[in-house]
UniProtKB/Swiss-Prot annotation:
Coiled coil: none annotated. It is an enzyme of class 4 (lyase). It comes from Clostridium botulinum (strain 657 / Type Ba4). The keyword Amino-acid biosynthesis applies. This is Imidazole glycerol phosphate synthase subunit HisF. Pathway: Amino-acid biosynthesis; L-histidine biosynthesis; L-histidine from 5-phospho-alpha-D-ribose 1-diphosphate: step 5/9. Belongs to the HisA/HisF family. InterPro entries: Aldolase_TIM (IPR013785), His_biosynth (IPR006062), HisF (IPR004651), IGPS_HisA/HisF (IPR050064), RibuloseP-bd_barrel (IPR011060).
Length: 253
């Protein structure tokens, strides 16, 4: 049985961890280094660190914060935000990240995925896909720049393409579900995870314990990501893992 992963996400804006609803109305949650260290001790399987303002503002990712965060961790760290080229990949990996997540830059330059996979290995390359259901309800479009720009690309087709280009994992966020706490987007996650043969991390919408069980049971997602639930101490990672174990899932305790 494949061990399912529970992953807290640190959305970082101007050096602080923030959380919003549907990608807006951001609240300050705290210091990224302290929060990452806390989750590491709590039993998180990995941590995702996203500098959500980096791409939009055209800034390089805050390498010093990444380095300080990585120094405190004994679990894999995925870093994204403002990664535009192979040099950015190299700099962030040298700062201590285990994997790099690309989103907007991969859309603008799909060859970046292929080149990064060739240079550093597919296991280092995560493609983040932010998807939103089309107005006609027939499928999902990919959004970039922190959910500000609709690319018009079909999310399922894009997932298929990034796998072919060499991505080792997909971080899939439902913009419709994000921040609502009404549960992960089962339909969207299922459609993507059954289309590709690489791991898919489900993101967006988790609000209670049962939502973790639902997404891991009713889709082929390999991991569940959450932010506000953990940041605001509504649930602990230990509670989630104990619940999943009771539900029959293989988890690392």
């Amino acid at each position: 049985m494949i061990t399912k992963r529970i992953i807290p996400c640190l959305d970082v804006d101007m050096g602080r961890v923030v959380k919003g609803v549907n990608f807006v109305n951001l609240k300050d949650v705290g210091d990224p280094v302290e929060i990452a260290e806390f989750y590491n001790k709590e039993g998180a399987d990995e941590i995702v660190f996203l500098d959500i303002s980096a791409t939009h503002e055209g800034r390089a990712t805050m390498i010093d914060v990444v380095r300080k965060t990585a120094e405190k961790l004994f679990i894999p760290l995925t870093v994204g935000g403002g990664i535009k080229n192979i040099n950015d990949f190299r700099d962030i990996l040298r700062a201590g990240a285990d994997k790099i997540s690309v989103n907007s830059s991969a859309i603008r330059n799909p060859k970046l995925i292929k080149k990064a996979a060739e240079c550093f290995g597919s296991q280092c390359v995560v493609v983040a896909i932010d998807g939103k259901k089309r107005k006609d309800k027939d499928g999902w479009n990919v959004f970039i720049n922190g959910g500000r720009i609709d690319t018009g690309l079909d999310a399922i087709e894009w997932a298929r393409k990034v796998e072919k280009l060499g991505a080792g994992e997909i971080l899939l966020t439902s913009m419709d579900a994000d921040g609502t706490k009404e549960g992960y987007d089962l339909e969207f996650t299922n459609e993507v995870s059954k289309t590709v043969n690489i791991p898919v991390i489900a993101s967006g919408g988790c609000g209670k314990l049962k939502h973790f069980g639902e997404i891991l049971k009713k889709s082929s997602a390999d991991a569940a990501l959450a932010a506000s639930l953990f940041h605001f101490k509504e649930l602990s990672i230990e509670e989630v893992k104990n619940y999943l174990k009771k539900e029959g899932f293989s988890v690392r305790l």
